[in-house]
């Protein structure tokens, strides 16, 4: 299944807007966690070829899914919620619901930048130092053969 091309800037703008509205009700640690991850997203936009930037943004998005669940479940006001408060809580919940989809798009971008999740990568193109294979230069002559040692 081919994912549609979604610009990273659109993902950032959407989550920034939803996080800003979510901060109407949930401030403090909710704001710090989400805006810090959005700063990593800005870094990923600024450095288009960086695998580190996009992988840290992806990891941060995954972490904020868990953190948002904790923040919303602990700090959701049970009584006296105004219309503005309901709107802010709804936007925070909408941001939480959209984060897994955003993670899929960001993971796709991570793979496009050359990222690979796993411990073993293909290293068949590399030659080990103690390899006994012939040198790459066909005209290279091993030491002591074909050349006279000249002393001064």
UniProtKB/Swiss-Prot annotation:
SMART domains: AGTRAP. Its main location: endoplasmic reticulum. The chain crosses the membrane at residues 24-44, 56-76, 87-107. Residues 45-55, 108-152 are cytoplasmic. Keywords: Cytoplasmic vesicle, Endoplasmic reticulum, Golgi apparatus, Membrane, Phosphoprotein, Transmembrane, Transmembrane helix. GO terms for cellular component: cytoplasmic vesicle membrane; endoplasmic reticulum membrane; Golgi membrane; plasma membrane. The modification Phosphoserine is found at residues 119-120, 131. It is a multi-pass membrane protein. The modification Phosphothreonine is found at residue 128. It comes from the Eukaryota. Residues 1-23, 77-86 are extracellular. One of its GO terms (biological process) is regulation of blood pressure. InterPro entries: AGTRAP. It is found in: Endoplasmic reticulum membrane; Golgi apparatus membrane; Cytoplasmic vesicle membrane. Appears to be a negative regulator of type-1 angiotensin II receptor-mediated signaling by regulating receptor internalization as well as mechanism of receptor desensitization such as phosphorylation. Also induces a decrease in cell proliferation and angiotensin II-stimulated transcriptional activity. Interacts with RACK1, and with the carboxy-terminal region of AGTR1. This is Type-1 angiotensin II receptor-associated protein. It comes from Pongo abelii.
């Amino acid at each position: 299944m081919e994912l549609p091309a979604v610009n990273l800037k659109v993902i950032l703008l959407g989550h920034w807007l939803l996080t800003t509205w979510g901060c109407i009700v949930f401030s403090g640690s909710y704001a710090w966690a989400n805006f810090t991850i959005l700063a990593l997203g800005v870094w990923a936009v600024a450095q288009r070829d960086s695998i580190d930037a996009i992988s840290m943004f992806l990891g941060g998005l995954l972490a904020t899914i868990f953190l948002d669940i904790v923040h919303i479940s602990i700090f959701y006001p049970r009584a006296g919620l105004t219309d503005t408060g309901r709107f802010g809580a709804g936007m925070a919940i909408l941001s939480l619901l959209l984060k897994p989809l955003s993670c899929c798009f960001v993971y796709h971008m991570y793979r496009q930048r050359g990222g690979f999740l796993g411990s073993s990568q293909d290293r068949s193109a590399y030659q080990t130092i103690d390899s006994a294979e012939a040198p790459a230069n066909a005209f290279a002559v091993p030491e002591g053969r074909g050349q006279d040692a000249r002393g001064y």
